[in-house]
Amino acid sequence: MPSKDSDETEDKSDTTQVIGNEILFYGEISVENILEFIEKFKKLEIELLKRSADLIDYSPVIRVHIMSEGGDIFSGMNAMNVIERSRVKVITIAQGACCSAATFMLMGGHERRIGQNAYVLIHQLSTEIWGKFHEIKDELKSCKKFMKCIKDLFMSKTEIPEKKFDKLMKKDLYLDARKCIKYKIVHAID
């Protein structure tokens, strides 16, 4: 009979893999998955900082590959904040599809790239609201704040014209590598 510990290990999602100085995040943007990402990211960051202290002319870089259909807005913002504050240069790379809340992780990179055949999807938030009328009004106020936050983020980090951004937010349109470079969502093709 397998032990309880082995059952728990089998259930672990492992959406984040570390290979050398590369982190592969392939999964949903959720509290659990982003916690796993942050744990592995911080461990690699510390390891690379120690290595840079020992080696002359060594400039550490973390490459974060992101393939995700999106998920929780707050978890995506959390990952972006951690990446932005890294003491090691971070290159974020959109792979496959980098959608919705996953684009926040992408935006956190000191340098942003995209795979030749990858796509980015930026769109308005979606939520479910139920409750008493005043609770619904409060939720609507919060959603408006979040939408402003998303717009401010992309207006400050990209060169998407405001009218184009407003159109993108109303539809689910995937942007290819060429469009992502044009609007400075990313800096280069990886």
Regions found by a protein language model. Give the residues of each.
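Terminal-region recognition feature
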Residues: 1-190
